[in-house]
């Protein structure tokens, strides 16, 4: 009868140890450090510069991708003055 009592108490502890991979909770929360290290190892590295967000300029230093930016903004972020100043340039780019 005593054997069953010990097994009854021992089985959950062994299972807990096997599931978590380590039984050393008393050494400075080793489980949380290990999990956070594993989680950061699985994160993908950020893309520093995507091709679509790269800007190219012509010889005068003007942005040659204004058409893309203009479509993305849909005229919401521009004032009327800026639109009237660049209307000719936009028309040329749209024609090309």
Curated annotation (Swiss-Prot):
Residue numbers of Asparagine amide PTMs: 96
Residue span of region Disordered: 36-85
Subcellular location: Secreted
Predominant location category: secreted
Residue numbers binding a divalent metal cation: 81, 85, 89, 93
Comp. bias regions, Basic and acidic residues: 56-66
Entry note: cofactor: Divalent cations stabilize the toxin the in alpha-helix conformation.
Reported cofactor(s): Ca(2+); Mg(2+)
GO MF term set: ion channel regulator activity; metal ion binding; toxin activity
Tissues in which the UniProt entry reports expression: Expressed by the venom duct.
Residues making up the signal peptide according to the UniProt record: 1-21
Keywords associated with the record: Amidation, Calcium, Gamma-carboxyglutamic acid, Ion channel impairing toxin, Ionotropic glutamate receptor inhibitor, Magnesium, Metal-binding, Neurotoxin, Postsynaptic neurotoxin, Secreted, Signal, Toxin
Residue numbers bearing the 4-carboxyglutamate modification: 81-82, 85, 89, 93
GO CC, any one term: extracellular region
Prosegment residue ranges: 22-78
Function: Conantokins inhibit N-methyl-D-aspartate (NMDA) receptors. This toxin has antagonist activity on NR2B/GRIN2B (IC(50)=1.4 uM) and NR2A/GRIN2A (IC(50)=2.9 uM) subunits, when tested on rat receptors.
Note: The mature peptide does not contain cysteine residue. Negative results: has no antagonist activity on NR2C/GRIN2C, and NR2D/GRIN2D subunits.
Stated family: Belongs to the conotoxin B superfamily.
Protein name, entry field: Conantokin Rl-C
Organism: Conus rolani
């Amino acid at each position: 009868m005593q054997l069953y009592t010990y097994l009854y108490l021992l089985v959950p502890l062994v299972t807990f140890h096997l599931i978590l991979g380590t039984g050393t909770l008393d050494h400075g929360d080793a489980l949380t450090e290990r999990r956070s290290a594993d989680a950061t190892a699985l994160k993908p590295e950020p893309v520093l510069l995507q091709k679509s967000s790269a800007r190219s300029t012509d010889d005068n230093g003007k942005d040659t991708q204004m058409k893309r930016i203009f479509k993305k903004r849909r005229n919401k972020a521009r004032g009327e003055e800026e639109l009237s100043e660049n209307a000719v340039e936009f028309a040329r780019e749209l024609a090309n």
